[in-house]
């Protein structure tokens, strides 16, 4: 990485760190007037602040850099092999199964050093992507992971006591999207995934295992892919052309997308030298031979030329979009109802007043709701009381009627008992009289018989 590019980035980062909250209002008329009032002066002698870029470069070299790559592609498409080849390092990534029930993201961080530059490299691999029968929501874990890294950085940024210089930035700087070399068109899963990622990360599409497709088919495939991306509104990363030193090569490389790549850590002897290549019965595919694949172009564009721009785009475009949406959800804005600049304190006081009014309104609603529910409950209880009273009166009336019936039956029964007793007494008297009469008659007959016998 050139010192001028590092200095340019660090100056930009220093400016962004102090004026992040007012980025959206810099185009206002007031800011324009302020810039017009700045005068340019010529110094009469040497001061020394010309060494500021060198100071920033030295400080940056001491702190080191971080770069985070997201590899999205089907299992076995060659993601790990390409990363190993790009950084000329064996990262010892283990093979993934084709039978994962859902998509998982696995992040591994490594510390690399080239000359005196230290790089903290994080590689995020999508495990199980495209292996499910239902692939409709396969992109969602990737989106959630990217948002989670943005949220972690935002929370660190919003802390009262923060340390962004020592904070391990895990935001994804580039997404290498591996496309299967079918030679036909993009899969629906690829279009859907890239469409949901293009506003959150810098996407660089690559055709994996390009040695399985002929050059003619590969060129047609590239044209077909770019046509589908444009027609579906997928925004992929474009190499910047605003820097005159790299504008020409970047413009040419933009026309070469997507890159058709081949990865390999195996060395094969070609001529008198050993090169990274793939050995086949029909010949050798050299990884770093531009006539065989676009690996060198990808490495030059990704690492040697535009790594810093990818980091800047992540911070100034994708993260700022996430940050703005989150702050707007919280009620923060740069301008008021009359399009006048609003400070954070004013926004805070306005939201505080709004929340206070909302709380009072909800408290009043809760009180009214409580009173209403109490009234409804009282009405229900009174209605239940009336029903119980009516039921009680009804039962009481039935009880009285039943009691009267029983009293009547008792009276009739007592009358029957008295009548029966009278009849019984009469019957007993009559029976005794009859018995006495019968006994008298028997004695008379006996006496008469005795007299006749004598």
Curated annotation (Swiss-Prot):
MF-aspect GO terms: GTP binding; GTPase activity; molecular adaptor activity
G1 motif as annotated region, ranges: 73-80
Keyword field contains Heme: no
UniProt modification remark: Proteolytically cleaved in vitro in a calmodulin-dependent manner.
Gene Ontology cellular component annotations, sorted alphabetically: cell division site; microtubule cytoskeleton; motile cilium; septin complex; septin ring
Keywords: Cell cycle, Cell division, Cell projection, Cilium, Cytoplasm, Cytoskeleton, Flagellum, GTP-binding, Nucleotide-binding
Subcellular location: Cytoplasm; Cytoplasm, Cytoskeleton; Cell projection, Cilium, Flagellum
Keyword Nucleotide-binding: yes
Gene Ontology biological process terms, A to Z: cytoskeleton-dependent cytokinesis; protein localization
Spans annotated as G3 motif: 125-128
Database matches in PROSITE patterns: G_SEPTIN
Matching Pfam families: Septin (PF00735)
Reported tissue expression: Widely expressed. Abundantly expressed in heart and kidney, placenta, skeletal muscles, liver and lung, as well as various tumor cell lines.
Domain named Septin-type G: residues: 63-329
Database matches in Gene3D superfamilies: P-loop containing nucleotide triphosphate hydrolases
Region annotation (G4 motif) ranges: 208-211
PANTHER family: SEPTIN (PTHR18884)
Oligomeric and partner information: Septins polymerize into heterooligomeric protein complexes that form filaments, and can associate with cellular membranes, actin filaments and microtubules. GTPase activity is required for filament formation. Interacts with ADGB.
Family: Belongs to the TRAFAC class TrmE-Era-EngA-EngB-Septin-like GTPase superfamily. Septin GTPase family.
Name under which the protein is recorded: Septin-10
The organism of origin for this protein: Homo sapiens (Human)
Lineage of producing organism: Eukaryota, Metazoa, Chordata, Craniata, Vertebrata
